């Protein structure tokens, strides 16, 4: 089941989310916006099982990686005007 995975620019490039993902949905790509010069990317969202281990592993105060389960995404879209 595919879920929506969003990477925010608060990512510090620590790779914790990438290492926590059991289905290799995430990978690091070059980015000049942080000291680590890399940011998480989610090129394989079709493999996301919605376990949210990436969210749990994120050390930032504002989660830099968020998984929106299919039901959450649908509900949010239904409320948009």
Swiss-Prot record:
Annotated membrane topology: Peripheral membrane protein
Cellular component GO terms held in the UniProt record: chloroplast thylakoid membrane; photosystem I
Gene3D superfamilies: 3.30.70.20
Keyword line: 4Fe-4S, Chloroplast, Electron transport, Iron, Iron-sulfur, Membrane, Metal-binding, Oxidoreductase, Photosynthesis, Photosystem I, Plastid, Repeat, Thylakoid, Transport
Cofactor(s) the protein requires to work: [4Fe-4S] cluster
Signal peptide positions on this chain: none
Any single biological process term in GO: photosynthetic electron transport in photosystem I
4Fe-4S ferredoxin-type domain segment(s): 2-31, 39-68
E.C. number: 1.97.1.12
Enzyme class per UniProt: oxidoreductase
Residues bound to [4Fe-4S] cluster 2: 21, 48, 51, 54
Transmembrane segments: none
Binding positions ([4Fe-4S] cluster 1): 11, 14, 17, 58
Family annotation (Pfam families): Fer4_7 (PF12838)
Superkingdom classification of source: Eukaryota
GO molecular function, one term: metal ion binding
Cofactor binding summary note: Binds 2 [4Fe-4S] clusters. Cluster 2 is most probably the spectroscopically characterized electron acceptor FA and cluster 1 is most probably FB.
Reaction equation(s) it catalyzes: reduced [plastocyanin] + hnu + oxidized [2Fe-2S]-[ferredoxin] = oxidized [plastocyanin] + reduced [2Fe-2S]-[ferredoxin]
Complexes and interactors: The eukaryotic PSI reaction center is composed of at least 11 subunits.
Role noted for this protein: Apoprotein for the two 4Fe-4S centers FA and FB of photosystem I (PSI); essential for photochemical activity. FB is the terminal electron acceptor of PSI, donating electrons to ferredoxin. The C-terminus interacts with PsaA/B/D and helps assemble the protein into the PSI complex. Required for binding of PsaD and PsaE to PSI. PSI is a plastocyanin-ferredoxin oxidoreductase, converting photonic excitation into a charge separation, which transfers an electron from the donor P700 chlorophyll pair to the spectroscopically characterized acceptors A0, A1, FX, FA and FB in turn.
Name assigned to this protein: Photosystem I iron-sulfur center
């Amino acid at each position: 089941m595919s879920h929506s995975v969003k990477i925010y620019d608060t990512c510090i490039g620590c790779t914790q989310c990438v290492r926590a993902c059991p289905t290799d949905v995430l990978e690091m790509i070059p980015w000049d916006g942080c000291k680590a010069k890399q940011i998480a990317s989610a090129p394989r969202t079709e493999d996301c099982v919605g376990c949210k281990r990436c969210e749990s592993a994120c050390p930032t105060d504002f989660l830099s990686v968020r998984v929106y389960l299919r039901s959450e995404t649908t509900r949010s879209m239904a409320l948009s005007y």
